[in-house]
Regions:
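Conserved PLP-enzyme active-site core in the AAT-like
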Residues: 142-306
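A short linear hydrophobic-aromatic micro-motif
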Residues: 132, 219, 376-380, 413-418
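PLP-dependent enzyme catalytic core of the Aspartate aminotransferase-like
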Residues: 421-448
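Active-site C-terminal subdomain of aminotransferase-like
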Residues: 228, 272-373, 383
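N-terminal entrance/gating region of PLP-dependent enzymes' catalytic architecture
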Residues: 1-131, 412-414, 425
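Short loop-beta-helix segment that forms the pyridoxal 5′-phosphate
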Residues: 122-146, 191-192
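Conserved PLP cofactor-binding pocket of PLP-dependent enzymes
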Residues: 383, 388, 411-428
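Conserved PLP-binding catalytic core of the aspartate aminotransferase-like
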Residues: 379-408
Length: 448
């Protein structure tokens, strides 16, 4: 298994041939198959003797890959898709071939140095001080959880007798905040948004002050959302930051999708207040054109995160010095250098190219909204703020939305699953792929 034989060399050529073809070609949309269906075709792929590299690659390329929806298809506008740059995808091959460990500076100094430069760019465009720092983790769920654990540790120092800890967030906050609260065994204070559907400081202040005055529960973190998954709305971060500072509460910004807009001049004003965050996350695998999976987690004062997350054991003592070890800043020890493909693409293309590509998603959303507003069967939920457009089909039941979505995928036109807003079924386009065109949008709208 560990010798580079002629068979391995042939397999390497086949892998590269497939990878290059996948990068050069228009991506297929494809779609899922049932487990029973896949098993009927493939049987058990794990055998005592093994299938051999050539045959196993064939199993993947001819069957398994086709049973996965391509997130980079230009008409995959579901959830928050992904559109990695060609450079980032190619460099992911290099990372995989290099056996790099990204948990410590001692073992991965060069790779960690590069990751930190990509993090530094995010810190700079957010407006945090140069002393801020961060780490790439698996995704937004792990990033939010890691930051909130640090926030609670800080609150414990000043309020050791608190009965129950509480996270204050919007009723529209991402599901990962609820997940973090469950894992941490803390409560959620879900606060209604204002008439613009934004969480603001006034609403949060009222809710927190009432909670603190009437219970022995205490809010240890306020979570603002910078680009909600459903509608792409940016909370009033500036007023949230003031409310948090006045009450000595940690301010965390979940920007997994939307904080990529920091590099787009046309919407930069929406993020006023993020510079006052104690921590934030943004996922390069969403709108910054990196492959899965990479979430950038940033702390204003990273030494606080190091206090919380550094693991101690006799076999780890050699790592405990002043060098920057990523394992000290989140809930992980073993980690791949998942930020490297993002760093490579960012370094190679330059930040101007990123600004242009993000602006393209914003333009697509605005132009699509105009088409939807003019469509006799459709109605906008609201004007797009970032790159998500939400709308309804007049007269449809929830079942009809789902039937349309299923048929669209079956016909390989696109992947647009329905969502919900205010209890009603909606459709939404999430534009993160610069290859999506208005012709693609029109093709989908023609089916409505």
């Amino acid at each position: 298994m560990h010798e580079f034989t002629s068979e391995v060399e042939e397999l390497a050529k086949a892998v590269m041939e497939y990878s290059l073809a996948r990068l050069k070609s228009d991506p297929p949309l494809d779609g899922p198959r049932s487990e029973a269906d896949l098993y009927a075709e493939l049987g058990n792929t794990i055998t005592a003797a093994g299938l051999g590299g050539k045959e196993t690659l064939k199993v993947f390329t001819e069957t398994l890959a086709l049973a996965c929806i391509s997130t980079d298809h230009p008409r995959n506008l579901a959830f928050i898709p992904s559109a990695p740059s060609e450079y980032s995808n190619l460099f992911d091959l290099v990372v995989g071939a290099s056996s790099l460990y990204g948990g410590s500076w001692q073992e991965g100094a060069g790779a960690v140095f590069a990751e930190n430069q990509a993090i530094k760019w995010l810190i700079d465009i957010a407006g945090l001080p140069s002393s801020a720092g961060g780490v790439f983790v698996q995704g937004g769920t792990m990033g939010n959880l890691s930051a909130l654990v640090v926030a609670r540790d800080q609150a414990r120092k000043t309020h050791p007798d608190t009965e129950r800890w509480v996270i204050a967030c919007s009723a529209e906050s991402h599901s990962s905040i609820t997940s973090a609260a469950h894992v941490m065994d803390v409560d959620l204070l879900k606060i209604e948004t204002n008439e613009e559907l934004r969480l603001d400081g006034a609403h949060v202040a009222t809710a927190i002050d009432e909670l603190h005055a009437t219970t022995n529960k205490r809010v240890f973190a306020i979570v603002g959302t910078a680009g909600s998954t459903n509608l792409g709305i940016v909370d009033d971060l500036a007023s949230l930051a003031i409310t948090a500072k006045e009450r000595n509460i940690w301010f965390h910004v979940d920007g997994a999708y939307g904080l990529a807009g920091l590099c787009a001049p046309s919407v930069r004003h929406l993020y006023k207040g993020v510079e006052d965050a104690d921590s934030f996350i943004v996922d390069p695998h969403k709108w910054l054109f990196a492959p899965f999976d990479a979430c950038a987690l940033v702390y204003r004062n990273p030494h606080l995160a190091k206090e919380t997350h550094t693991q101690h054991a006799s076999y780890l003592e050699t790592l405990h010095d002043d060098s920057w070890s990523p394992s000290d800043y989140a809930i992980h020890l073993t980690r791949r250098v998942r930020g490297l493909p993002f760093w490579f693409s960012l370094a190679a293309h330059g930040t101007d190219a990123y600004s242009k590509a993000v602006e393209e998603g914003i333009r697509l959303a605005k132009d699509s909204a105009k088409l939807i507003a003019a469509h006799p069967n459709l109605e906008l939920v609201r004007e797009p703020e970032l790159s998500i457009v939400a709308f309804t089909r007049k007269g449809w039941s929830p079942a009809q939305y789902q039937e349309w979505s299923d048929a669209l995928l079956e016909m390989q036109i696109g992947f647009i699953p329905p969502s919900k807003h205010a209890g009603e079924s909606i459709l939404r386009f999430a534009f993160v792929n610069p290859w999506t065109s208005m012709d693609d949008v029109q093709m989908i709208l023609d089916t409505l």
